[in-house]
Amino acid sequence: MINKYKVSENRLSIMEIERFAFHDGPGIRTVVFLQGCPLHCPWCSNPESQKRKPHLLHIKNKCIGCGRCEAICTRGNISIQDHFPVFNRQACVACKACERICPQNAIKFVGESITSSEIMEILLRDRDYYLNSGGGVTFSGGEAFTQFEGLMDLLIQCKNEKLHTSVETCGQVNLDKIKQALPLIDLFLFDIKHTDKDLLQKETGANLDTILTNLRYI
C-alpha cells in the first residue's frame, strides 16, 4: 500500500470519463478528463474543459430561438433577446431543465462534480480489460494537475489496486507537484505546445522555462 500521501475523499470536477479508449496510452484504458487548465490555447480540442467548475455552454449556431428554455426556467435566469437566449450564469443552479428541453441540443452543461470514490468505482469496472491488454487509467483534461489533491488521491488508489497510470500534461505545473506525483505515474504524455518562448507565452499564456524544467526532471 502506498501511504506517502494522505488519501481523503475529494470532489473533482470532471468533463467526461471515457471507457475503452485506445489512444491515450498502451492497451485498453479508461480516460478521466478533469476540468480546469492554466492555458488558453486557441487551437484547444476541448475548450469547454478550460474552466474548472461545471458551467453552462450555449452553442449558438445550433439554436433556433424557440424560447423553450426561457419558458422552462422557473428561476427566470433565461431571457430571449434578439431571438436568442441570454443566460444569467451566476444565478444558475444547474438543474439542467433547459438542457433537457432544447430540441436542438444547443444547451449543454459541461462538467460534473463527483467524488474520488465514485470515480474509482467506474475505473475498477474494467480491471480485467486493463490486465489482459496491458492497459490502465489515463488522467487528462484540461490539465490534470489543476486538481492536484484529487489527482493524487486517485493515483494512490490506482496504484493500491495495481492499475497502470498515465497522466497527460501541458507541463505548466509547479515542480513540487511533479515531484510528489512522479512515483505514482507509470507514463507521462507530455504535450509541449510550442518551442518558441515568446510565441508560446503570447498564444497560450504558458512559460517555456517552467515546462522544460519539469520535462528535464521527469
What are these regions (language model features)?
Residues 31-33, 79, 138, 166:
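Short, conserved beta-strand segments within well-ordered enzyme catalytic domains
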Residues 117-218:
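Conserved AdoMet/S-adenosylmethionine-binding subsite of the radical SAM
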Residues 1-11:
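Iron-sulfur (Fe-S) cluster-binding modules
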Residues 14-68, 85-94:
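N-terminal pre-triad scaffold of radical SAM enzymes
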Residues 35, 63, 92, 113, ...:
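Short, surface-exposed acidic/glycine-rich loop or hinge patches that mediate macromolecular interfaces
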Residues 42-49, 68-87, 97-113:
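Iron-sulfur cluster-binding cysteine motifs and their immediate structural context
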Residues 58-64, 111-126:
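Extended, non-globular alpha-helical segments
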